[in-house]
Regions:
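Membrane-embedded alpha-helical bundles of multi-pass transporters/translocases
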Residues: 1-542
């Protein structure tokens, strides 16, 4: 119960802040859409951001994933590697945090050295990177030149994002979640400000510069909190620390898996660069909408439960790890399955309401809605897969997720090459959704024998009720939306879309909450949501 309350408190804090973060992020995307639309400049910005961000996603993402379990084991004094290296650290009391902070300082310094060097090299070879990732831009030299310049401006975010994530997961391990989550709010607000300041003066290049400034702020706000939590940074490079070696061993498979996953992102951009102008931007805007429920609900849950899962695994309490994993899966389903239905039924009015203004016209809405309708089919799978993935990582098993990723990326690529012929950019979105569902199926299959007392009925019975409640909710939303569209005469104006989305969503929410409360798919789940709701309200009220 104590672990459950800890997860609920953490998830509640994260969701409360996520409400602010997603609101800020949406206003940011609205501003970018209104200022630049689905134009050549936006396509160039998206590709440049991808090039600059991809190295961080490969290296920084892998580092953050394996750092939490190792760092947590040093904080709790239960690191199995240390027990085999008593000659090196015989006098070290791991309940004293000096060894943990020594490990953290070494990893931070290695990150600066490695990704700092990668940034310098990346800026130098940007012209070739752009040709590699967007060969379809070649017939338009102006577009290639602009993309190259934007890539060179934004390449420092490779290092800055990695530091931000490393600081964030360190604080998460210490059960502090608020400030790392607030980092995305600071990032979005800074980028938003740059749209109207630097962007208004220097166009898309100003937006690129503002993106870099935003990542600097995202890193900076976490430093004082780390210090208050007891971190004592030092210019140490202790490569003999057993934790460093352990991270190195664990990181290899994750690095490979991330590289494979990001290779697909490269390939997707290559394919999309050959499509009509605006398709890359439309995929980007649709992806932002699709990931809204994931970032707001599923990601918050995953971040909140990972330290708890790591602690259970470190203590070899596999029964508790299974229970936490099941709780995470059910909570993800409770929140993302109705969100899937909501986005499917109201896709077009949501896109119009969110983006259609300024340079983002009716054509842009059509492109974005088409992609969104396919992306959203993978929403629950994406959130649930992340829960299962973290269970593997908590068990220090990085090999299985990598093998799964390699297989599903190849599947994703094959589907994309087939579907893009018939659905254009929608084919890329559908391929991603199919791959997300395959990821979930494989992860479930391979994790099941690893944890004791795995009872599928305990998981699928409540999820079945959630699916049924979501379907009835979707029918209510559809009927309400059709009536409102008739009442407004099919108007695409802002107020008409606001009424349609607002009223239909409210009706759907009432139906869904009523059915969930009536059917009670899982008593423990309902209690967790009740506590989480109280926590969110408390945080929002301050």
């Amino acid at each position: 119960m104590a672990d459950q309350n800890q997860v609920v408190r953490a998830a509640g804090v994260l969701m409360a802040i996520s409400v602010l973060a997603r609101l800020a992020g949406f206003i940011r995307e609205q501003a970018i859409a209104a200022q630049f639309g689905t134009t050549m400049a936006t396509d160039a910005y998206v590709v440049a951001y991808t090039v600059a961000n991809i190295v961080y996603l490969i290296i920084g993402g892998a580092l953050a994933t394996v750092f939490i379990p190792v760092f947590a084991s040093y904080l709790t004094g239960s690191n199995p590697v240390d027990a085999k290296n008593k000659n090196d650290y015989r006098q070290q009391n791991h309940l004293d945090r000096r060894s943990a902070w020594n490990l953290a300082s070494t990893i931070i310094n290695l990150t600066v050295l490695v990704l700092g060097g990668v940034t310098i090299i990346g800026i130098a070879v940007s012209p070739w990177l752009v040709q590699l990732i967007a060969p379809g831009f070649a017939p338009e030299p102006e577009k290639v030149q602009l993309t190259t310049q934007l890539t060179q401006i934004m390449f420092p975010i490779t290092l800055l994002f990695a530091l931000s994530m490393l600081f964030g997961v360190t604080l998460n391990t210490l059960q502090h979640f608020a400030v790392p989550a607030l980092g995305s709010v600071v990032f979005s607000l800074t980028v938003l400000a740059s749209v109207f300041t630097l962007g208004a003066t220097w166009g898309i290049k100003g937006l690129a510069a503002g993106t870099v400034i935003a990542t600097v702020f995202q890193v900076a706000i976490q430093v004082p909190v780390l210090w208050r939590k007891g971190m004592r940074y030092s210019l140490v490079l202790d490569l003999k620390h057993p934790g460093v070696r352990q991270i190195g061993v664990l990181m290899g498979p994750v690095l490979l898996g991330n590289a494979v996953a990001q290779a697909y992102v490269f390939i997707e951009r290559i394919i999309a660069s050959h499509l009509a102008e605006g398709c890359i931007a439309a995929l980007n805007f649709a992806n932002k909408l699709y990931l809204l429920p994931f970032n707001l609900f599923a990601l918050a849950i995953n971040i909140a439960i990972f330290p708890t899962m790591s602690a259970h695994a470190a203590n070899n309490d596999l029964a508790a790890l299974r229970k936490t994993t099941f709780g995470g899966l059910k909570l993800v389903g409770l929140l993302t399955i109705p969100a899937m239905v909501w986005l499917i039924v109201l896709a077009e009015p949501i896109v119009r309401l969110t983006f259609e203004r300024g340079a983002f016209d009716d054509h842009s809405t059509g492109l974005t809605t088409f992609a969104l309708s396919f992306y959203v089919l993978g929403l629950f799978a994406l959130g649930a897969f992340n829960v299962l993935n973290r269970a593997f990582y908590a068990l220090h098993d990085t090999r299985t997720p990598v093998l799964i990723s390699i297989f599903t990326v190849l599947f994703n690529l094959a589907m994309a090459l087939i579907l893009v012929r018939y659905l254009q950019h929608g084919g890329l979105a559908l391929a991603a959704a199919l791959a997300a569902n395959l990821n979930l199926i494989l992860a479930y299959y391979f994790l099941r024998p690893r944890l004791p007392n795995w009872r599928g009925r305990e998981l699928f019975a409540p999820l079945g009720k959630i699916v049924l409640a979501s379907g009835i909710m979707g029918a209510g939303i559809w009927v309400t939306a059709r009536c409102l569209i008739q009442l407004t005469g099919g108007s695409t104006g802002l107020m008409a879309q606001l009424l349609t989305v607002g009223i239909a969503s409210s009706v759907g929410l009432i139906i869904y909450l009523g059915l969930i409360w009536w059917w009670k798919p899982d008593e423990e789940l309902v209690e967790m949501v009740r506590k989480m709701g109280q926590r969110v309200v408390q945080r929002v009220r301050g």
